[in-house]
Amino acid sequence: MDHRLLEIVACPVCHGKLYYNKEQQELICKPDGLAYPVQDGIPVLLEVEARALTLEESHP
């Protein structure tokens, strides 16, 4: 995923900063506990497509 894009995208729920998890190919919103998928380098920033983070993922 293009890191320039990461600088301008925001969580669609809280409008907060997203963190890229390269291993899982996801954008993470820590405050909301959501992970948005990145498919073919394109973030899918739809709340219905996001998965809830596990407790371990939320508080490492």
UniProtKB/Swiss-Prot annotation:
Family annotation (Pfam families): Trm112p (PF03966)
Cellular compartments per GO CC: cytosol
Gene3D superfamilies per UniProt: 2.20.25.10
Top-rank taxon: Bacteria
InterPro entries per the UniProt record, alphabetical: Trm112-like (IPR005651)
HAMAP family membership: UPF0434
Similarity comment: family membership: Belongs to the UPF0434 family.
Name of this chain's protein: UPF0434 protein ETA_21370
Organism: Erwinia tasmaniensis (strain DSM 17950 / CFBP 7177 / CIP 109463 / NCPPB 4357 / Et1/99)
